[in-house]
Amino acid sequence: MMNRTTPDQELVPASEPVWERPWSVEEIRRSSQSWSLAADAGLLQFLQEFSQQTISRTHEIKKQVDGLIRETKATDCRLHNVFNDFLMLSNTQFIENRVYDEEVEEPVLKAEAEKTEQEKTREQKEVDLIPKVQEAVNYGLQVLDSAFEQLDIKAGNSDSEEDDANGRVELILEPKDLYIDRPLPYLIGSKLFMEQEDVGLGELSSEEGSVGSDRGSIVDTEEEKEEEESDEDFAHHSDNEQNQHTTQMSDEEEDDDGCDLFADSEKEEEDIEDIEENTRPKRSRPTSFADELAARIKGDAMGRVDEEPTTLPSGEAKPRKTLKEKKERRTPSDDEEDNLFAPPKLTDEDFSPFGSGGGLFSGGKGLFDDEDEESDLFTEASQDRQAGASVKEESSSSKPGKKIPAGAVSVFLGDTDVFGAASVPSLKEPQKPEQPTPRKSPYGPPPTGLFDDDDGDDDDDFFSAPHSKPSKTRKVQSTADIFGDEEGDLFKEKAVASPEATVSQTDENKARAEKKVTLSYSKNLKPSSETKTQKGLFSDEEDSEDLFSSQSASNLKGASLLPGKLPTSVSLFDDEDEEDNLFGGTAAKKQTLSLQAQREEKAKASELSKKKASALLFSSDEEDQWNIPASQTHLASDSRSKGEPRDSGTLQSQEAKAVKKTSLFEEDKEDDLFAIAKDSQKKTQRVSLLFEDDVDSGGSLFGSPPTSVPPATKKKETVSEAPPLLFSDEEEKEAQLGVKSVDKKVESAKESLKFGRTDVAESEKEGLLTRSAQETVKHSDLFSSSSPWDKGTKPRTKTVLSLFDEEEDKMEDQNIIQAPQKEVGKGCDPDAHPKSTGVFQDEELLFSHKLQKDNDPDVDLFAGTKKTKLLEPSVGSLFGDDEDDDLFSSAKSQPLVQEKKRVVKKDHSVNSFKNQKHPESIQGSKEKGIWKPETPQDSSGLAPFKTKEPSTRIGKIQANLAINPAALLPTAASQISEVKPVLPELAFPSSEHRRSHGLESVPVLPGSGEAGVSFDLPAQADTLHSANKSRVKMRGKRRPQTRAARRLAAQESSEAEDMSVPRGPIAQWADGAISPNGHRPQLRAASGEDSTEEALAAAAAPWEGGPVPGVDTSPFAKSLGHSRGEADLFDSGDIFSTGTGSQSVERTKPKAKIAENPANPPVGGKAKSPMFPALGEASSDDDLFQSAKPKPAKKTNPFPLLEDEDDLFTDQKVKKNETKSSSQQDVILTTQDIFEDDIFATEAIKPSQKTREKEKTLESNLFDDNIDIFADLTVKPKEKSKKKVEAKSIFDDDMDDIFSTGIQAKTTKPKSRSAQAAPEPRFEHKVSNIFDDPLNAFGGQ
């Protein structure tokens, strides 16, 4: 070709430069002597062309070879086909030959023999044929008599039987049920099958003796009689029989005269048939006892059969058999009326037992045993039989989804077992009577409600049917089976602890949430081991019970709300919506959950790592994930605190779980920085929340309520959660720190009553109140934290929490905020300390005090809680105003109300809201949006809240509360108004602030003003509005939104926050928080925790410094934040401008404090992880943008959620890191301050701290701080030291562990290094990730 081209090229040269065309070999040779650059170019062209030709030629050859291979393969295939054809032919011929040989041989021989026989015996044969024919006829008649019932159309026309043909023509033969005399064995797997060794086959002999033998004997005797009589006195027997049945068969007596063997046999047959026929007609017109018996039996059988079909699809065959058996028994009864009458009585009795559920025979019963058994299943709830049937259907449908996934126990067995285990314990105390029908017994009490709830429970009986909740609880427990006994036990305990229905419902939700978590998270984590761990966690079922006994009160209160939750449970079953159903904690959510489940599952698939965090959305998931971080944090804390009063067994189990989860989640964490934020948070809450959940509930609870609420909102609110999480988280944190501080104070009052501990109860009450109160309260939060806290309890708590308690939590928060608001200064601590005074000192009393909650606190605490819940309406207005109207503005206005309660909350909220003021207008729509992401957060927890407007308000308030810890202070009130609007993302103002500032540094914050909208994604905000009740809807969206929107909103809102933070209290605490943010873009990026702490400290500072620094409502701000929070407040102001200096100062404090208060940073981290899982996801979304993004720098986790988790955990990790580094320590302290300021943060931190403190010192002060959120400044120092003591190791170990799988302890120092070193890069990453991750969080939006 070249030679070809060469001449052309040589001809062409004149027209084009020589160097632009490939040269030919000849040209190259010619110019070899006078080589030039053009020759080089030509040579290059030549070589390139040569290469291309070689490649193309190679491809051609390759194609040819491929074609050859294909042809070879096709040839081989055809060859094998031919072989196979030959083999088939050979086999066929072989078989045919064998068959033909045999056939040929036999016919020939037979034919010959027959011929000889025929020839010899034709006459004889005829003679012989007569008896043979007679015998055959007799046999045939016997068969007709024995195997067929003759429906005698001519029952009255037996005269016409004279014409055998006519009689036969008119005869209608109905085959008898062969299985009356010889019943089939029971259905395999049925109760009777399991219980009886003969599986219904051996009972034939026994029951045949009575019934079967009567039948058999009757039929046999009848047949024998008929044979004998037909041979001998067929007419006589007919006469006897007909004399017996004379009334029945007066016409047949005429036929009795016809005594031909065949006529008699036929008559006998017809008589029998007539008798049977008459019996049947008698059934319609029962004239004789046999008829009545038959009719009655038939009725019973029909009733049974009818029942059976409803109860047992498999029973359908049996009902037929039963009917046949009944018919046949009736027939024998009719055939031998005297004998039959006695036996039919027996038969009738048997039938009546059968009808009554005994079964014709035990075997018959076996046939119907399932029916009867199922009837029995529902028979105990016989009222519920229909309910049972529908329940079974529901259970089957829902259970399979549920049970199969995690528990994967048989739907029925699982349910029965789960409910046997779960419901039996539930039944155990309240429902023990109905243990036989575990499922039903839960249902049994409200059988109608069962179905109403079951059917409507998902949607209609959301709130109306706690009863069905039990059924669903059973289902959930079957689902809980996933958590097998744990949740089953939880449910048992819960059912016992709570009103069985309510608790069960709660359990269901928990189970669902937990299953979801366990499923989604445990899928990674080995749900079974996790379940086992959880079970171990709830091996202290008393505690679970206690949690739920207190929750039970909450559940009782929230029973109607819980039913809404229950729908979640239902959805839980429906979902594997579950994941959504967690969110669909509301009944309607089920549908929403389906959508969200799809959404979220898709998101989970795509954001599986992220959406492990998203999985946090599922309270269970988030709880699991949270629990692991909480658990991990709590693991360290718990391992440290194992010996502490907190249930060591539970702790250890939970720790084991936490350990599992830690490692599991550490994997997830790395993967799921987003998810880890949630995953770790989930982990944190799981392990931490499991034990620390309440302790961590303060933090994890906060984080977790944020997680729970945010987890609900997590995926949605991960994007939109910055405000919602900020709000929800911060609000939740602050609500939980503030509100929950108040709530805990109220709840502490409750839980003090419950737990009766003020000091330890304070520190632990933070955790335990958070557990118990927050379990109660945060049973809504349970979704977020209490659930994680008690994973087993979590289902309970969560269930209680999800619909009820989050709402309750928020309502309680609000109520506590309102009432405790008032109480906070006066009543919160009093409420909390008197009641929590001694209780928390015994950590184990946590659970036993939860039991106390059932016992003592139920009245007081729940009086408090109930008050809180009663306050809920006002809280509704509180939250309604604050959250609905004033996510940003009403929260401002309301903050006054809320401010008291949420002095911390609202201060933070104010700060957040100030920062969020830009978003405020957005959050006007966003309020509901963010609020609703909050509500999705609440979705888990607020599902109950859904019933209340506060749900959205709560979301808002939680968003506000996220900020509100500062707002909780009176001073913060004004700030709240100012600040609240500014920061949807500043809902976790500090964190968000820091984030914002960090984002400001990395100008991603411009959208921060719109972050609220961006967070919520107004559409989702609208969804969230309805999400209150159908949180699932929002959650599906919210998760992605939370991440994407939160990140975008965190960027924009943070920038807006950074801009708006300076003003008003935000400038105050935003100085602390934002300067930390501004300072923390790096620091916060490096140490998102510190930023969060600083932000929290800053947030705490306003209410702390502004409202009552001494009262520092947030325990964090109090103990840590007070020393550091005041510094943060003012240093935060300085931090705002001199954030580094302030942070350095703060950090130096924190260094000392963090050195002292490793627990504090860990608590901060934990709080942050709890806070920031939700709050931290909001805040850490800013942090995501900063700390989490620095974490991306660390982990290069693209997902803000992961980063958020990292950030959350970076806050925590960074707190640890910062604990290591003074700047970061300052941030940590600030974060802790913020956490202290943020009741939510404080509680979040405190729970970690508490967990650690409890674990280390049973930090009563933490809870005191929580209780003294408003008045606990004094306790704060204890918290500090305890935080110092515990936080470091706990935080380092747990938080790092929790938040960074690999970064546990090492992360603390590496993190501080990487946090400071990578703060800006991370922040840059986060900024990029803010947009990238949010898009990713949104799935590419």
From Swiss-Prot:
It comes from the Eukaryota. Residues 356-600 are annotated as: Sufficient for interaction with CCDC93. Residues 937-1339 are annotated as: Interaction with phospholipids. Residues 1029-1047 are annotated as: Required for interaction with F-actin-capping protein subunit alpha (CAPZA1 or CAPZA2 or CAPZA3). A motif (LFa 18) lies at residues 1234-1240. Keywords: Cell membrane, Endosome, Lipid-binding, Membrane, Phosphoprotein, Protein transport, Transport. Residues 202-214, 1094-1110 have a biased composition (Low complexity). A motif (LFa 9) lies at residues 690-702. A motif (LFa 6) lies at residues 572-583. A motif (LFa 14) lies at residues 878-888. A motif (LFa 12) lies at residues 839-847. A motif (LFa 3) lies at residues 450-463. A motif (LFa 10) lies at residues 726-738. A motif (LFa 20) lies at residues 1290-1299. A motif (LFa 4) lies at residues 482-491. The modification Phosphoserine is found at residues 539, 550, 909. Residues 202-405, 422-609, 621-662, 696-734, 751-796, 820-840, 886-951, 988-1205, 1302-1326 are annotated as: Disordered. It is found in: Early endosome membrane; Cell membrane. A motif (LFa 2) lies at residues 411-419. A motif (LFa 13) lies at residues 856-862. Residues 355-366 have a biased composition (Gly residues). Residues 233-242, 293-307, 507-517, 598-609, 637-647, 751-768, 823-834, 898-909, 917-931 have a biased composition (Basic and acidic residues). A motif (LFa 8) lies at residues 664-674. In human, WASHC2 has undergone evolutionary duplication, with 2 highly homologous family members WASHC2A and WASHC2C. This is WASH complex subunit 2C. It comes from Homo sapiens.
